[in-house]
């Protein structure tokens, strides 16, 4: 069994903040400079779509604070209506974030657009995107199955909206907010369950609690002034490295400058409550976001994880694949409910976990919004081939388990990690003692 030690200063920049910084930069008046922008495939898809819509932008490598280089993106825009027709379908590749949030912006532009993606993205449901945009006055056409291609007939006459999110979704919340920026009047977005709040923080939107629900106020046609953004390290990426340390006794890894926004760092609370040896150091606030360093040590006894609270599930939705694999390998069992959103990600992640954990000898029982895993890992064959289902988080979750435990696991598609974590395998190599 391997041991992993070291300091991580090359974690990918936060994917969610990178998307939003680029989109807000394209809506702002002036020059927006984004330091430490993500080089992952999804974030590059967002830049590609902005460029195709006529938004001037540049991207270059500059020296990083810990050595090496980081990515700086500069976007120049004249405000909300700086977008131009592309003349061709806008290629989002595998990025659901790009497709959904761009739909909100394009709904407010006075021209038609078409959003497309790769085979995986074209199967993902988009009805929740279409509904509020149609209510605001935009035309939205989907396939008969409610998926992309998404054809949008934008308009400068969008109506304000009062929209209650039916399920927690930061992407749907964000696309409604981006559309509402173009509307004539004030819109309100109601969240019964809090989801990640980067969009409202970065736009400076007013949010308050009313009768136990969160209400976000979006003023229409407000001038957005360009400002610089510094993107911290991605907590969803940090989750994999923390799990690596926890699964490998004797390991000790320090991860620098990680986003610790409360809507993103709940996975740490779950791991600590289960017995994980994790401490947070150098906590501070930069650009409205909590940032800190995470120290994770292996060797402790981890209790089985059971996640059911809807608010908690919403805050760890991207980390559930890694939490599931961590719990099964460390304790033999795992349980989650109220997580139906996982079935609409890059793949049906609940089913993907069940398929692969069964290949490892686990007993898995799926429900519409969750799963129960028991029996522990007891693979009968070697190597065990893990089907990645074109999903970076499924691939990385099982890759971490293989590295930490020494189990002979083969990924069906290791290249898919480049969607969010291009240096994933190189980083694992550098940490192994």
UniProtKB/Swiss-Prot annotation:
EC number: 2.5.1.19
Catalytic function, reaction form: 3-phosphoshikimate + phosphoenolpyruvate = 5-O-(1-carboxyvinyl)-3-phosphoshikimate + phosphate
Single GO BP term: amino acid biosynthetic process
Entry binding sites for 3-phosphoshikimate: 15-16, 20, 169, 171, 318, 345
Enzyme class: transferase
Keyword Amino-acid biosynthesis carried by entry: yes
Keywords noted in UniProt: Amino-acid biosynthesis, Aromatic amino acid biosynthesis, Cytoplasm, Transferase
GO cellular component annotations of the record: cytoplasm
Lineage: superkingdom: Bacteria
Cited Pfam families: EPSP_synthase
Active site per the UniProt annotation: 318
InterPro entries: Enolpyruvate_Tfrase_dom, Enolpyruvate_Tfrase_sf, EPSP_synthase, EPSP_synthase_CS, RNA3'P_cycl/enolpyr_Trfase_a/b
Residues annotated for phosphoenolpyruvate binding in this entry: 15, 96, 124, 171, 349, 393
Pathway(s) per entry: Metabolic intermediate biosynthesis; chorismate biosynthesis; chorismate from D-erythrose 4-phosphate and phosphoenolpyruvate: step 6/7
MF GO annotations: 3-phosphoshikimate 1-carboxyvinyltransferase activity
Subcellular location: Cytoplasm
HAMAP family to which the protein is assigned, alphabetical: EPSP_synth (MF_00210)
Function field: Catalyzes the transfer of the enolpyruvyl moiety of phosphoenolpyruvate (PEP) to the 5-hydroxyl of shikimate-3-phosphate (S3P) to produce enolpyruvyl shikimate-3-phosphate and inorganic phosphate.
NCBIfam families associated with the record: aroA
Protein family membership: Belongs to the EPSP synthase family.
Protein name, UniProt field: 3-phosphoshikimate 1-carboxyvinyltransferase
Gene symbol of the encoding locus: aroA
């Amino acid at each position: 069994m391997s041991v992993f030690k070291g300091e991580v200063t090359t974690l990918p920049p936060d994917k969610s903040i990178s998307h939003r910084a680029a989109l807000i930069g394209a809506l702002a008046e002036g020059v927006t400079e984004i330091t430490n922008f993500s080089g992952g495939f999804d974030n590059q898809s967002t830049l590609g779509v902005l460029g195709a819509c006529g938004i001037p932008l540049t991207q270059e490598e500059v020296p990083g604070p810990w050595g090496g280089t980081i990515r700086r993106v500069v976007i120049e825009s004249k405000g909300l209506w700086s977008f131009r027709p592309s003349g061709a379908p806008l290629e989002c590749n595998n990025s659901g974030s790009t497709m959904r949030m761009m739909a909100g912006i394009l709904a407010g532009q006075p021209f038609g657009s078409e959003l497309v993606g790769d085979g995986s993205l074209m199967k993902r449901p988009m009805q929740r995107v279409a509904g509020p945009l149609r209510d605001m006055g935009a035309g939205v056409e989907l396939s008969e199955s409610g998926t992309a291609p998404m054809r949008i007939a934008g308009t400068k006459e969008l109506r304000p909206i009062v929209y209650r999110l039916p399920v927690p979704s930061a992407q749907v919340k964000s696309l409604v907010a981006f559309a509402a920026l173009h509307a004539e009047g004030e819109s309100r977005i109601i969240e019964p369950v809090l989801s990640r709040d980067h969009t409202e923080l970065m736009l400076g939107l007013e949010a308050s609690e009313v009768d136990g629900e969160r209400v976000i106020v979006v003023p229409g046609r407000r001038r957005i002034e360009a400002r610089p953004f510094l993107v911290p390290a991605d907590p969803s990426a940090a989750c994999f490295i923390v799990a690596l340390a926890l699964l490998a006794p004797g390991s000790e890894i320090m991860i620098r400058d990680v986003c610790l926004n409360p809507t993103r760092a709940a996975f740490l609370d779950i791991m600590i409550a289960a017995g994980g040896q994790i401490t947070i150091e150098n906590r501070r606030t930069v650009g409205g976001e909590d940032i800190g360093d995470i120290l994770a040590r292996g060797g402790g006894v981890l209790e089985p994880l059971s996640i059911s609270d809807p608010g908690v599930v919403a805050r760890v939705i991207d980390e559930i694949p890694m939490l599931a694999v961590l719990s099964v390998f460390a304790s033999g069992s795992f349980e989650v409910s109220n997580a139906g959103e996982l079935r609409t990600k890059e793949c049906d992640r609940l089913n993907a976990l069940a398929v692969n954990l069964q290949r490892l000898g686990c007993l898995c029982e799926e429900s519409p919004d969750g799963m129960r895993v028991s029996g522990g890992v007891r693979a009968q064959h070697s190597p065990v081939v893990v089907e990645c289902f074109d999903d970076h988080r499924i691939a990385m979750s099982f890759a971490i388990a293989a590295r930490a435990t020494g189990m002979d696991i083969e990924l069906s598609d290791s290249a898919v990690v480049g969607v969010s974590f291009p240096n994933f395998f190189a980083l694992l190599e550098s940490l192994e003692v």
